[in-house]
């Protein structure tokens, strides 16, 4: 009897394979994980919030972080946490990096009044998308409705 209970617990802990695909899609394109599950309102609200934060951050002149602009090891290490936060936006980060949008080391851009607000919006967009991704993953895994 104990053996069957243990097997049931192990089976309950198994994550369906499509949950990983949904999670990856949700990270890569904000809101896509919920769209794949036909959760239209969640996709519009959660994905839309990430997209809006990202583009508002860019419009305010925010700076996206990567590892290439540090001169010393200590300054490079300090850029890792914000880079991980920015990387949370998935394809938005990758496309911005490829186009060079938001990565400029410009003194004029840094002097803008809205520069720090833009940085904050960009960081929040990435962190929020991590939460949206986990929500889509949990729904696909059956842990949440």
Regions found by a protein language model. Give the residues of each.
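Transmembrane helix recognition focused on a "late"/terminal membrane span
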Residues: 2-23, 46-145
